[in-house]
């Protein structure tokens, strides 16, 4: 049985991109359309770099035109928990004290994911200091469960869980 693109594994998505069954651009646009449609009710993703992700998708497709594969996750659209340092993005851990903290470096894990070929396009909501059973903080508000908006998707990685469950991303590190 063929699953919709947004519920396929990251390795399945990468394989389709690498084998030129889908372009990195089209895959990214699929996920961005889902974010636009579903994220307003979920508040799972709280920061996005759409322009940067589109450029990376173009670069991923151009690399394949030259026979270059970036890694096993070539072109896969990915989001990541807000607490990870991603250059140019807020990293607050949901704490108002760090509201204006924008990091200028990538965490080692982010560097390694990018080396594997991912297209990191957004960050997912977290509870205050990553330490609650639900996902709420004063900066970004509440993340809702995609299957029942009156419920929580859980705590520390709730934004990541909601984004994956709703098919807003091909991969997430929470």
Segments (PLM) and residue ranges:
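Glycine-rich, aromatic-flanked loop segments that form ligand/cofactor-binding clefts
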Residues: 61-84, 118, 123-125
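An N-terminal boundary/leader segment
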Residues: 1-55
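Flexible, acidic active-site loops/lids enriched in D/E/S/T/G that coordinate Mg2+ and/or position polar
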Residues: 50-73, 99-103, 113, 133-153
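Generic hydrophobic alpha-helical segments
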Residues: 13-17, 60, 160
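Short glycine/serine-rich loop segments
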Residues: 105-174
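Conserved hydrophobic residue
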Residues: 22-23, 69, 169
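Enzymes and membrane/adaptor proteins characterized by extended Gly/Ser/Thr/Asp/Glu-rich
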Residues: 72-109
């Amino acid at each position: 049985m063929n699953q919709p693109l947004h519920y396929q594994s990251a390795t399945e998505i990468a394989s389709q991109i690498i084998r030129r069954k889908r372009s990195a651009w089209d895959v990214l646009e699929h996920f961005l359309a889902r974010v636009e449609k579903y994220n307003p009710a979920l508040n799972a993703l709280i920061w996005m770099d759409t322009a940067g992700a589109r450029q990376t998708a173009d670069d991923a497709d151009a690399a394949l035109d030259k026979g270059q594969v970036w890694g096993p996750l070539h072109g896969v659209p990915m989001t990541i928990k807000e607490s990870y340092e991603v250059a140019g993005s807020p990293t607050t851990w949901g704490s108002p004290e760090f509201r204006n903290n924008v990091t200028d470096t990538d965490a080692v894990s982010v560097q390694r994911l990018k080396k594997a070929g991912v297209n990191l396009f957004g960050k997912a909501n977290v509870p205050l200091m990553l330490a609650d059973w639900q996902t709420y903080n004063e900066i970004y508000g509440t993340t809702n469960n995609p299957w029942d908006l009156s419920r929580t998707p859980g705590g520390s990685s709730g934004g990541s869980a909601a984004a994956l469950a709703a098919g807003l991303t091909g991969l997430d590190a929470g």
